[in-house]
């Protein structure tokens, strides 16, 4: 220790450093969207190798037969490897995952918005309205689009890893598991740890899981009646 530095100042600096590291640990890590949202690519060769890719439309890892050369990075040897890489992709309603179709041959194009799964935002495009009865990723304005498609948010501390603490007690507590979206029991030692620590499972659910289960109200659009048929399949 620097003899010229007061003891109190050293303790304060140590406390601030630990607090900053704790805050950083609460933030969710990257979701690998640049890999997981790449389209399925079999490659040009003719081998039949069992692989797994993240399917943006079902929001799950699925099997495919890889040709053996080229392709892209959305290509995993096992389901577990795919799930480990892509589970952080935020879940959105099915209609918000659909590709946008541009009606180049229609007249009277109007400004619409679609949800971009890669950027997780709503973006402007011009639609001719040729397929008004088709279920599409198409909304009349940005607010309607974001209101229905934007991923549900939970407090940042819900992403903090399970932390049993630093002491020697054996206290049953609960933490939110963001991967499986469940509140699980763990043994807390009585001191230290982080804010992802709840006295009861219900407290954990109220803080971290309740917002994820709340259903969003379907906007009143031309294709709303058909979209209702797929609501049961939403995550």
Curated annotation (Swiss-Prot):
It comes from Homo sapiens (Human). GO terms for cellular component: extracellular matrix; extracellular space. Residues 36-86, 96-149, 158-208 form the BPTI/Kunitz inhibitor domain. This inhibitor contains three inhibitory domains. Disulfide bonds join 36-86, 45-69, 61-82, 96-149, 106-130, 122-145, 158-208, 167-191, 183-204. One of its GO terms (molecular function) is serine-type endopeptidase inhibitor activity. Its main location: secreted. Finds in a complex with ABCB1, TFPI2 and PPP2R3C; leading to the dephosphorylation of ABCB1. Glycans are attached at residues 116, 170. Keywords: Blood coagulation, Disulfide bond, Glycoprotein, Hemostasis, Protease inhibitor, Repeat, Secreted, Serine protease inhibitor, Signal. This is Tissue factor pathway inhibitor 2. It is found in: Secreted. The lineage of its organism: Eukaryota, Metazoa, Chordata, Craniata, Vertebrata. GO terms for biological process: blood coagulation.
